[in-house]
Structures are given as structure tokens and as C-alpha cells.
């Protein structure tokens, strides 16, 4: 009741609801030490005159881009499987050969990587991909076209991205628009061999649709 400010890195287990803010009459600000504010009732905060802030620092979005790169390399190179096989003494097993997608000619040059969302994280991820000489496409209706041009990325619609990408990487915040944006229809458009990387919020992807696709 006496709080003037609330802060936290991840408060999804105890979201800041309108009722919580109403119980703190002196509350002036809810400050997130991370990028997402999906665990704060922003609409209620606006009505109550409470400022909501986030921290879009490089240490946040750059680390996510690096984590995305790490996941892709781990999957393509079968890092976990190789580690486990080495410990079992089966390091010569032919099934441990790397996974190569697209027309393999020079490294991963034949790969098409599609990014849904082209904000700071995705653009940093694009920088990390530069030495790979892969084809990069992206979908983001809110980013000006010049951003894509400056990053040497081809801007496409969502359907095209899903159909053409060998790797689909999600880089969006969780909003009403993006919640469950990857569902049965979207997964059905993807290649059978495609890899889906989600370093956004889990609720961006329809979990049941994803499980069904993997099992069938």
C-alpha cells in the first residue's frame, strides 16, 4: 500500500494486475528491468496514471540474439547428440553428421533464415549471421523499409516467410496481436524439415498445434 514504485526483471509468476496497482494509491511507476511488459496490465496502469517502463538495453537484446545463434548451431551441428555419444563411446556413429538444409555448396550458403519481427534483437542476429552468407528474409509490418535495406535483408509477407524458410526465428514481444500467432495454419505452411526457434514469449506459439505437428 505504501509503494511509490514497483520493479522487477521477470514477474510473470506474479503479474502486476490492475487490482495490485489499485491497492497501492501512491504508486507512480512500474519499471521492468527487461524488455517485455506483457506481465503488466498496461491498460489498467494508463487509467490509473501509473507509468510503465522497460529496459531495452543492449545487454538484454544482444544476449537473446546470441542465444538464438547458439540454438541454431546446436541443432544444425547436433551438439547435444554428439556430446552424449562421445560419453557413450559412440563418437563415430554416422547419424551424428551435421544437419545440412537447403543446397549445401559452401558452409550454410543455401540456407534461408526467416525472422518474424525485425527489431533490435533480430537486427543483431542478422549481424551475427553475416559470415554465413545465408539468405535472410524478415516479416515486420511496423518497421520502416529502410531498416531491411540497411541490413541487407529481404522484406516479405508472413506467408512467404513461412513457406520459404529453412529456419524460422521469432523475435516479437507478446501482445494481443502476437499471442498464438504461430498456430495450425502457420505451422502447416512451413517446410517439413524446417526448424522453429522461439526466443520470444512461449505464448507466441500455439503449443498444442506445435506438438501435433511434431507427432504427426
Language-model regions: role of each:
Residues 1-57, 163, 183:
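An N-terminal-biased, well-structured beta-alpha scaffold segment characteristic
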Residues 1-6, 133-135, 146:
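N-terminal glycine-/charge-rich "phosphate-binding" loop or analogous flexible N-terminal tail
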Residues 17-21, 137, 141-216:
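Rossmann-like adenosine-cofactor binding region
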Residues 27, 109-112, 184, 193:
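Phosphate-coordination loops involved in phosphoryl transfer and adenosine-cofactor binding
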Residues 56-112, 127:
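Phosphate-binding beta-alpha-beta segment of Rossmann-like dinucleotide-binding domains, i.e.
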Residues 118-119:
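Glycine-rich Rossmann-fold phosphate-binding loop(s) that bind the pyrophosphate
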Residues 122-123:
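N-terminal Rossmann-fold NAD(P) dinucleotide-binding loop
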Residues 126, 130, 214:
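Gly/Ala-rich phosphate-binding loop of Rossmann-like dinucleotide-binding domains
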Amino acid at each position: 500500500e505504501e509503494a511509490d514504485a514497483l520493479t522487477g526483471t521477470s514477474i510473470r509468476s506474479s503479474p502486476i494486475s490492475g487490482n495490485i496497482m489499485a491497492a497501492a494509491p501512491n504508486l507512480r511507476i512500474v519499471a521492468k528491468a527487461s524488455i517485455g511488459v506483457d506481465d503488466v496490465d498496461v491498460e489498467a496502469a494508463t487509467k490509473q496514471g501509473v507509468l510503465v517502463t522497460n529496459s531495452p538495453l543492449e545487454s538484454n537484446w544482444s544476449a537473446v540474439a546470441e542465444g538464438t545463434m547458439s540454438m541454431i548451431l546446436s541443432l544444425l551441428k547436433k551438439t547435444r547428440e554428439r556430446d552424449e555419444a562421445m560419453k557413450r563411446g559412440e563418437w563415430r556413429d554416422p547419424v551424428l553428421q551435421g544437419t545440412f538444409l537447403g543446397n549445401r555448396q559452401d558452409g550454410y550458403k543455401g540456407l534461408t533464415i526467416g525472422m518474424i519481427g525485425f527489431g533490435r534483437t533480430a537486427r543483431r542476429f542478422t549481424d551475427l549471421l553475416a559470415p554465413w552468407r545465408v539468405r535472410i528474409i524478415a516479416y515486420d509490418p511496423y518497421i520502416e523499409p529502410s531498416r531491411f535495406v540497411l541490413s541487407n535483408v529481404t522484406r516479405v509477407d508472413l506467408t512467404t516467410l513461412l513457406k520459404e524458410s529453412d529456419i524460422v526465428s521469432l523475435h516479437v514481444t507478446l501482445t494481443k496481436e502476437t499471442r498464438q500467432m504461430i498456430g495450425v495454419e502457420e505451422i502447416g505452411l512451413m517446410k517439413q524439415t524446417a526448424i522453429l526457434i522461439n526466443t520470444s514469449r512461449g505464448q507466441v506459439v500455439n503449443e498444442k498445434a506445435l506438438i501435433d505437428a511434431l507427432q504427426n
